[in-house]
Amino acid sequence: GLLSAVKGVLKGAGKNVAGSLMDKLKCKLFGGC
């Protein structure tokens, strides 16, 4: 239903945010900017 669709979108957005944060962290740690 609608609720599960919303949950799926939120999960996807959370993964995207976490991924970009990890990229920034790696960038700072390893100087790969």
UniProtKB/Swiss-Prot annotation:
Subcellular compartments: Secreted
One GO CC term on file: extracellular region
Tissue occurrence: Expressed by the skin glands.
First-listed, main subcellular location of the protein, grouped into a coarse class: secreted
Disulphide linkage map: 27-33
Alphabetically ordered keywords of this record: Amphibian defense peptide, Antibiotic, Antimicrobial, Disulfide bond, Secreted
Gene Ontology biological process terms in this record: defense response to bacterium
Domain of life: Eukaryota
Keyword Zinc listed: no
Entry similarity comment: Belongs to the frog skin active peptide (FSAP) family. Brevinin subfamily.
Function as written in the Swiss-Prot or TrEMBL entry: Antimicrobial peptide.
Name the UniProt record assigns to this protein: Brevinin-2DYa
Native source organism of the sequence: Rana dybowskii (Dybovsky's frog)
